[in-house]
């Protein structure tokens, strides 16, 4: 393994941590309807648990309504039940072959609670990035011990990894700021 390999691994893993954080924040409900709200809803189907997005088309025809169209109509009740039991505070209405989900406006209290959750998710993302940094620094130290790196090369690589860490944590901070702004919009 070379310095370049370690840096490449760091960048890939940090990008994955940012993407995971982005997806988790997208699934937090804001004041308007968007299909990502339901992306993490788990439905009991075919004797297993599956993501709702794998079982149905989810659309947002307007800012206050989501429509779920199951591909298998026998799953309508299971999907309705899963949405009701999710902690999203939504009340699905079964309408023949589809499920309508009105999105009520968020109360101030609920907005603040969602911001706390968003901050927690973001902190988990930052912790993930720091764990990648720690792992990569250990890899560099191993390379130095094996005499594949000089002290100067090690120091340069450590600075590069710190630069990547700062860059990816900044990305998470920007995503969080945008989500907080979105949640506070009335």
Swiss-Prot record:
GO cellular component term of the entry, any: cytoplasm
Keywords assigned: Cytoplasm, Protein biosynthesis
Annotated InterPro entries: Ribosome_recyc_fac (IPR002661), Ribosome_recyc_fac_dom (IPR023584), RRF_sf (IPR036191)
Domain of life: Bacteria
GO-annotated molecular function: ribosomal large subunit binding
Cellular localisation: Cytoplasm
UniProt xrefs under CDD domains: RRF (cd00520)
Listed GO biological process terms: translational termination
Residues passing through the membrane, by range: none
Family assignment from sequence similarity: Belongs to the RRF family.
PANTHER family given in the database record: MITOCHONDRIAL RIBOSOME RECYCLING FACTOR PSEUDO 1, RIBOSOME RECYCLING FACTOR
Function description: Responsible for the release of ribosomes from messenger RNA at the termination of protein biosynthesis. May increase the efficiency of translation by recycling ribosomes from one round of translation to another.
Protein name: Ribosome-recycling factor
Lineage: Bacteria, Pseudomonadati, Verrucomicrobiota, Methylacidiphilae, Methylacidiphilales
Gene: frr
């Amino acid at each position: 393994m070379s310095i370049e390999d370690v840096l490449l691994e760091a960048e890939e893993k940090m990008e994955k941590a940012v993407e995971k954080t982005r997806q988790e924040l997208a699934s937090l409900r804001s004041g308007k309807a968007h299909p990502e709200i339901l992306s993490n809803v788990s439905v009991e189907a075919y004797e297993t648990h599956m993501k709702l997005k794998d079982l149905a088309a989810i659309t947002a025809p307007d800012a206050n309504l989501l429509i779920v169209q199951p591909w298998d109509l026998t799953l309508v009740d299971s999907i309705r039940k899963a949405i009701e039991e999710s902690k999203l505070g939504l009340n699905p209405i079964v309408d023949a072959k589809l499920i309508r989900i009105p999105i009520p406006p968020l109360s101030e209290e609920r907005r603040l609670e969602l911001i706390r959750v968003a901050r927690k998710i973001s902190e988990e993302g930052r912790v993930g990035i720091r764990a990648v940094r720690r792992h990569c620094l250990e890899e560099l130290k191993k390379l130095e011990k094996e005499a594949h790196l000089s002290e100067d090369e090690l120091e340069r690589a450590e600075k590069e990894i710190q630069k990547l860490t700062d860059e990816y944590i900044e990305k998470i901070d920007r995503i969080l700021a945008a989500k907080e702004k979105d949640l506070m919009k009335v």
